[in-house]
Regions:
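Amphipathic alpha-helical segments of the small helical/lid subdomains adjacent to P-loop NTPase cores
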Residues: 3-125
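Extended alpha-helical interface modules used as scaffolds for assembling large macromolecular complexes
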Residues: 2-5, 12-22, 75, 107, ...
């Protein structure tokens, strides 16, 4: 029903509205998939748990609940697990992921990074959640799905040329990070995927979920046993590597706020690389300093 409405709006065919109304009239209840509905639908279709495993999940919750707020350190309007029931309903996903991935889809649509068919992205989100859950079907109990895992094959295949172009340089650079240590290279790719998603949400959403090292760290958490500080330290190294190679730039936080990061555009990247490639020899530096010194002394006289 909702798809029909959106198709009519897209086509701008006013005279078809009456036909649409007649079709809708055959249904007693119009079920909306807007707002928080993807969470409800996903829980029922994909994440609904068998009764016999709920006790096991309850035990897992009690084992880890003291660490959730630390491992999944999130901005105020994004949540981890509020209760045992919440945990059972969402596991192995984390509640904030539904809100954030919807913001990513909406923004990618506006930027032209994904096909127009993604409109009505509630269904696209359900498909991404389903494909991610399916890919983790054999994972051990206690494993959490991290946000970067939502950027999976299905998501990538939906990228238009414009979206692919925006992330290609970053991924190529990430694949050169500590190539003698495959796990470090994989982490660099994960960081790029997360940054690509959260650096491209709307300006309003970025105020709520800025691209900081802490937030990137939270999005990469996939277990409760690896200390958060260990993950954060590795993320910082990757971020510095990407900054040094003119993939992203650091923007200093104001009034004590943490620094944020954003991708260079292709044009900005070329300029940054050109500036970085300019080598000034010692003689040139000496001449420049001499000129400055002479001008300063002359002004004093």
């Amino acid at each position: 029903q909702q798809d029909l409405s959106e198709i009519m709006d897209d086509c701008h065919i006013a005279e078809e509205k009456d036909k649409e109304g007649k079709i809708k009239g055959r249904f007693e209840v119009k079920v909306s998939l807007k707002g928080t509905q993807p969470e409800v639908i996903t829980q029922k279709r994909i994440l609904d748990k068998k009764e016999e495993v709920k006790d096991t999940l309850a035990s897992l919750y009690n084992k880890y609940k003291a660490g959730f707020d630390l491992q999944f350190k999130l901005p105020n309007s994004y949540s981890s697990y509020d209760s045992q029931d919440d945990f059972i309903d969402y596991y192995p996903f984390v509640p904030y992921q539904f809100k954030l991935i919807m913001q990513v889809f909406n923004s990618f649509l506006n930027l032209g990074y994904v096909a127009k068919e993604v409109k009505g992205n509630e269904r696209s989100i359900i498909k991404v959640i389903h494909s991610t859950a399916k890919a983790n079907a054999d994972a051990e109990l206690g494993k959490f799905i991290s946000f970067d895992e939502l950027y999976n094959n299905m998501f990538e295949e939906g990228l238009q040329a414009r979206g692919q172009k925006a992330v290609d340089n970053a991924l190529r650079m990430a694949r050169t990070y500590q190539t003698d240590k495959p796990e470090k290279t994989r982490l660099a790719i994960r960081v790029v995927n997360v940054l690509f998603m959260i650096c491209n949400i709307s300006q309003t959403d970025q105020l709520l979920f800025p691209a900081t090292v802490d937030n990137v760290t939270s999005l990469l958490v996939n277990n409760m046993d690896t200390p958060r500080l260990t993950i954060k330290n590795e993320v910082e190294k990757v971020v510095e590597f990407l900054c040094d190679n003119n993939i992203i730039r650091r923007e200093q936080g104001k009034q004590g706020a943490p620094d944020t990061f954003t991708f260079y555009s292709e044009e900005e990247m070329k300029v940054a690389q050109l500036i970085q490639s300019q080598v000034v020899d010692n003689n040139t530096q000496a001449e420049q300093l001499k000129d400055i010194f002479n001008k300063y002394i002359t002004a004093l006289r």
